[in-house]
Amino acid sequence: MSEVVTAAPAPPVVRLPPAVRGPKLFQGLAFVVSRRRLLGRFVRRYGKAFTANILMYGRVVVVADPQLARQVFTSSPEELGNIQPNLSRMFGSGSVFALDGDDHRRRRRLLAPPFHGKSMKNYETIIEEETLRETANWPQGQAFATLPSMMHITLNAILRAIFGAGGSELDELRRLIPPWVTLGSRLAALPKPKRDYGRLSPWGRLAEWRRQYDTVIDKLIEAERADPNFADRTDVLALMLRSTYDDGSIMSRKDIGDELLTLLAAGHETTAATLGWAFERLSRHPDVLAALVEEVDNGGHELRQAAILEVQRARTVIDFAARRVNPPVYQLGEWVIPRGYSIIINIAQIHGDPDVFPQPDRFDPQRYIGSKPSPFAWIPFGGGTRRCVGAAFANMEMDVVLRTVLRHFTLETTTAAGERSHGRGVAFTPKDGGRVVMRRR
């Protein structure tokens, strides 16, 4: 009696979305110089899914469809892994941005406690204090850019949240972090040269600042561990130093340094940019502003939370999230994508999709009163297993800053056209810095 041999099913045939026409070099340079405008034009020409060839990432499938975004964000890390290259080029191999699979899951579990529960209440006071300190010297009745002030507030707040009390080392970090973030944000969008051009090159300057940063962090870790009250400290560094993985192991000194730099950089520029946009938007929407001031005076917060959500949608600061295909093929909706391709979720285009957000150009916090936004259409923090670990902290910080400013200042409205978006490499900020006129109440 002969055996019946059943053949393994053939893998799906590769089927890619429409391909963008044009040489790889042109697509890559256009992506670096003006990616938001470029991707918007491609969506209008090719639809909500298309294939491109981008200098730094190679072959990519770009999607601007919430249903496809849902599938990407809910796929396992074994199917869709970390895009290459990623921001670990800036922060180091010990950053959560560098990790994948089990290592990434373990690290996120370790990082979660400082950004949830009781820890968050401790940070509210810090943020309010830093807001009052920064706004004490605001000009009265004169236009000024709010973005630099927001950068100061968010940097000082995250420094105090991470390290506790101040000191000379924190002053050194205040000197190092802003230029590092500005340069690093721009270099993140560019391929890294294989040759080392020394300290005078942009990458060389970044490396030199990193060496200075590491020296400061070593001193801070030593001081933290030597503190007689170390076991009772609630700052992020103390929580990280006391935390252990499931097997009892602890984070290495290098990993702590990389992770702290990630929190300092990623946790300050993006939040500051969103706050700058918030003041820019509110100054041009008097009805929303008046309702927010009334709510603040009455001790409410629902509309303020909705306004923060709407700013993050209408003026998206981080415009894409990405994954890399690991299996031989990955089926995304009707498309079949081969291994080695990357998938880019076009956050900015999804946030501006009229099928998802009616009248998307209208600034309307009422969209979120009484209902939560879809986690796969409203995605300023990305989604899935790689969603920003500090999202709750960032939203709380924005809430406290707006509440404090509106409680103490009158924001004058204007009929001027809205500010254009300015790309800083990774983040998009108001081109004129969110210029407004304030008067103390």
UniProtKB/Swiss-Prot annotation:
**What Pfam families does the annotation carry?**
p450 (PF00067)
InterPro entries found in the cross-reference section? Cyt_P450 (IPR001128), Cyt_P450_CS (IPR017972), Cyt_P450_E_grp-I (IPR002401), Cyt_P450_sf (IPR036396), Cytochrome_P450_monoxygenase (IPR050121)
What's the top EC group for this one?
A: oxidoreductase
- Residues bound to heme are C388
Task: Give the cofactors, semicolon-separated.
Answer: heme
Report keywords, A-Z: Heme, Iron, Metal-binding, Monooxygenase, Oxidoreductase
The protein's GO terms of the molecular function aspect are: heme binding; iron ion binding; monooxygenase activity; oxidoreductase activity; oxidoreductase activity, acting on paired donors, with incorporation or reduction of molecular oxygen
Q: Which domain of life is it from?
A: Bacteria
Write the Enzyme Commission number(s) for this entry: 1.14.-.-
The similarity comment for this entry is: Belongs to the cytochrome P450 family.
- From the Swiss-Prot or TrEMBL record, give the protein name: Putative cytochrome P450 138
Q: Which gene codes for it?
A: cyp138
